[in-house]
Swiss-Prot record:
InterPro entries: RNaseA, RNaseA-like_dom_sf, RNaseA_AS, RNaseA_domain. Interacts with and forms a tight 1:1 complex with RNH1. Dimerization of two such complexes may occur. Glycans are attached at residues 34, 44, 92, 111, 118, 138. The keyword Zinc-finger does not apply. Gene3D superfamilies: Ribonuclease A-like domain. The modification 3'-nitrotyrosine is found at residue 60. Substrate binds at residues 65-69. It comes from Chlorocebus aethiops. It catalyses: an [RNA] containing cytidine + H2O = an [RNA]-3'-cytidine-3'-phosphate + a 5'-hydroxy-ribonucleotide-3'-[RNA]; an [RNA] containing uridine + H2O = an [RNA]-3'-uridine-3'-phosphate + a 5'-hydroxy-ribonucleotide-3'-[RNA]. This is Non-secretory ribonuclease. SMART domains: RNAse_Pc (SM00092).
Length: 160
């Protein structure tokens, strides 16, 4: 007894569940703008150790994120990258709002090594490097983002 593809209620529920999981992996918490969420995820490394720093992000998302990269630079410096020439985004070439950093920055890449349902028990290893990065930038939220930044980073697209 094999369910018919896409007509079975079970297949439909599985498909919707997978779509929901994929959507939630990239969702930002509602209280933040995309720029604020970018800063939390990729600039504000609250601790020098990934396991502790990732706890901040994981608390907002209520799950252990598989990996994350922290750029050891300032938000203002990343905003400045948004002024570099636009290019297609490597992760989605139909988007043309990406910008290459032009200079390497120190960064820390965190990789989940011990997943857990309890986010306090998730453990990460970290790798340090100096690399270029590519960010996607959009117009800022005129009400909630700093007014001195009309264009802001919203997504770390690639580290190279």
């Amino acid at each position: 007894m094999v369910p018919k593809l896409f007509t079975s209620p079970i297949c439909l529920l599985l498909l919707l569940g997978l779509m929901g999981v994929e959507g939630s992996l990239h969702a930002k918490p509602g209280q933040f703008t995309w720029a604020q969420w970018f800063e939390i995820q990729h600039i504000n490394m609250t601790s020098g150790q990934c396991t502790n720093a990732m706890l901040v992000i994981n608390n907002y998302q209520r799950r252990c994120k598989n990996q994350n990269t922290f750029l050891l630079t300032t938000f203002a410096d990343v905003v400045h990258v948004c002024g570099n020439p636009s290019m297609p985004c490597p992760s989605n070439t139909s988007l043309n709002n990406c910008h290459h950093s032009g200079v390497q920055v120190p960064l820390i890449h965190c990789n989940l090594t011990t997943p857990s349902q309890n986010i306090s028990n998730c453990k990460y290893t970290q790798t340090t490097a100096n690399k270029f990065y590519i960010v996607a930038c959009n117009n800022s939220d005129p009400v909630r983002d700093p007014p001195q930044y009309p264009v802001v980073p919203v997504h770390l697209d690639r580290v190279i």
